[in-house]
Amino acid sequence: MDLARIVACRGPYGSTRLPVLASQAPLVLRASGSVVRLVAAAGGPLGGDVLCLDVEVGDGAQLELRSVAASVVQPDRAGQESLVTLRARVGAGAHLSLLPEPTVICAGATHRAQTYVSLGLSASLRLREQLVLGREGERGGRVGALLHVDRGGRPLLRSTLNLDGADDVTNSPAVLGDARTVGSMLTVDPSWEDPALRPAPWSGNDAASLDLEGPARLITALAGDTVALRRLLSIR
């Protein structure tokens, strides 16, 4: 397993320090202030890859994690599964934004993504996930996405999504229909403990918001392309 690691700590005058920024090929990390960008040095993931990123945001620190480009998951000759795991711990009064570019699941690929986040009670979070089934003209491969988020040591969200671009049920009107992208945006904002500050819930044909227990909201959306998907996920 290839492990990359980030540790963010609160610095002087509210700044954020990164005492640990450890890349592990093919996961290469590049920092600018409190923003870290993930560069996939060798492309992929490729079937058989097992990659892990460990993130720790200390009390009062802020970290934004992005990727430079979309991840394109491709099959290997043996048809092996690829696995990417992200584990994050966010301390008291700290903030973490996880805003990677979309993950494209190529035809013939099998991929699993696992995200585990542990938040302090006064921590805040923005977490966006975007999946694309196939490149242009492809139906896409198989993907399983698991998301576990705890707040104050208690479960906040448990989500599992399994899709197969070659499966007729996945492509039926009951699941994706004509959509090729699916995504979610999870926001945890302690200020929403005050109901007057929480945005009103909403829903539409292709997206909806769901208020979770505590000061948290999950938006889920379907779209024909990533531009439309990101627009839907940006609605508060």
Identify what each model region corresponds to:
Residues 1-102, 107:
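N-terminal, charged/glycine-rich beta-strand/loop interface patches
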Residues 3-5, 50-52, 83-85, 112-114, ...:
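Broad gene-expression machinery/nucleic-acid interaction feature
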Residues 27-29, 49, 74-79, 108-110, ...:
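A short, polar/proline- and glycine-enriched secondary-structure boundary/capping micro-motif
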Residues 39, 129-236:
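A structural signal for small-residue-enriched, beta-sheet-centric alpha/beta enzyme cores
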Residues 58, 118-120, 150:
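Feature marks extracellular polysaccharide-active and adherence modules
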Residues 62-64, 95-97, 124-125, 183-184, ...:
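Structural motif
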Residues 106-114, 120-144:
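Acidic (Asp/Glu-rich), glycine- and aromatic
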